Amino acid sequence: KNNLKIEARTDKNNKRYYFIRIAEPIQAKKISFGIGRDYSGLRVITVSEISFYNYDSLEDDIMGLYEDELHTVLKGSVTEQTIQDLRNRLQTKDEASGEYHPDKDRLEKELDNAEDILNNQLSEPILVHNTITTRDTDRGFSGLNAWQPLGITAAAGEEITLFVGHNTMGTGSNTNLQLVATQYHAESGSVSKVVTTLKTGRNDVTIPKIWSTDEESGGALYIQYTGNNANDRYSVRVNGGVEVPTLDLYGVTDAQERQQRAEQYVEALKGYVEKMEAVHKKVHENSGNESVEYEYSKENCILGATDILLDKMLFSLPAQQVLSGCEGNAQKLLDSMDAMEGMMNLFYQHKGLNQTAPDEKDRFPQRHLNIRYQRMFA
């Protein structure tokens, strides 16, 4: 039983059938099918046709293009010719049956996904934390969200492409991930918008304009997990926008790893902030996108958006101010973050919450308090 995967499918005539996949090729003289029915006896299952297919390594070869099980990173040896050779095999009918591969449509999507990844300049994969979710229990206070930074800032009207991978779902499947667009240096009523619910594989998205203020429009992008499954493993890569340094310390308890991540982040910030005005002139002033065709302003340029993700807090701040505040010192930054986490512990304990409480509503929230760089009320 553990070596079988049974999928209920529907053909082009809306007739249901079942696709049975055996984990590994077998040699057999006899195969037995046991077909039952429910206890009511009203629904009789009948079988009009059974098709058997010879083993073909094509599916394994296509899945073998990827470095990771989430299908967002290709192996270094993959070329356009590698993908084309597999596509040619997929377009060839089986000699014995005279039919194409029974999973031809799904495998074509996998090849399209691999080709897209190969031909695009993508950001590094972001692994989604499945313990930060919108399905968190309501505890009677607001100000929390389930946003996870993608390390990308994008202008309103800009078209970007996101590639989503999952540990079990095939390309084109619906996910529990939403893309959230935000406005940098926003007013209180125009901070964010859920743009779309993503599918596995390629997602082409246009970033919406969130406000009408005569300043640059756009900001940091986030993923929001809406599920509640500990086995969900998602990875996201982005083509488009501008990569911005971010620091993810969520769930990181090892002191050495925290130090290393903080040092890498601060070094990345130094190089990024130094070049920010030049990048603005290149990708904003000369972009042809009126949403960002403004003279450089360090207060309003959306390139300034950086995020620091902690266990209970998400900081969304100007990159220049983070660098200035820590004076380019990773240890000073870590000390500040540790102090904030300690304050959040006291804050939640004051509300009667306890991380080890038996009832979820009495535990610390899974969502984050988000401190953002925003405009003061007029």
Give the ranges of each region predicted by the language model.
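Extracellular carbohydrate recognition and processing domains
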Residues: 2-22, 190-208
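Residues that flank catalytic or metal-binding motifs in active/ligand-binding sites
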Residues: 16, 27-29, 41-48, 158, ...
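Beta-rich interaction/scaffold domains
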Residues: 57-119
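Beta-strand-enriched, solvent-exposed domains that form extended recognition/catalytic surfaces
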Residues: 116-258
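Exposed low-complexity, polar/acidic, P/S/T/G-rich flexible segments that act as propeptides
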Residues: 40-58, 227-298, 303
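Beta-strand secondary-structure signal
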Residues: 19, 32, 161-163, 222, ...
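Aromatic, loop-rich ligand-recognition surfaces of beta-strand-rich domains
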Residues: 1-2, 12-57
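Catalytic cores of extracellular degradative/oxidative enzymes
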Residues: 282-378
